[in-house]
């Protein structure tokens, strides 16, 4: 499943998920993707793809590896409703373009609770 050379994000995900499964057998394990952020297609200030990838690349890796281990994914990247590239949403929920404020956390809490109730 994708690149498993020793220093890749994929290796880290596989290692983490296997360790969680082995440490907590029979317990529910859920995975969440990161939220959108302002400048998410940029890496180190440069808005062009680099060798390490974009935030979406990391989100897709999380989705793929979690699916490989049959772990449920709360895809906040896809369903949070928090998109800081929209000025009104950023001002109301993520003023710094990355971290949700109290109102943003209330939205996330509702999403998380609803997701956990289905697991």
Show the residue positions of the predicted features.
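Alpha-helical cap/lid subdomain in secreted, periplasmic
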Residues: 1-119
């Amino acid at each position: 499943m994708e690149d498993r050379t020793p220093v890749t994000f994929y290796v880290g995900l596989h290692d983490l998920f296997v360790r969680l499964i082995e440490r907590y057998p029979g317990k529910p394990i859920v995975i969440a993707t990161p939220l959108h952020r302002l400048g998410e297609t940029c890496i180190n200030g440069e808005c062009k793809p680099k060798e390490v990838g974009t935030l979406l690349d990391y989100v897709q890796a999380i989705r793929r590896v979690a699916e490989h281990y049959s772990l449920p994914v709360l895809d906040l990247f896809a369903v949070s409703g928090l998109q800081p590239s929209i000025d009104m949403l950023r001002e109301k929920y993520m003023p710094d373009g990355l971290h949700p404020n109290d109102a943003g956390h209330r939205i996330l809490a509702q999403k998380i609770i609803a997701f956990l109730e289905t697991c």
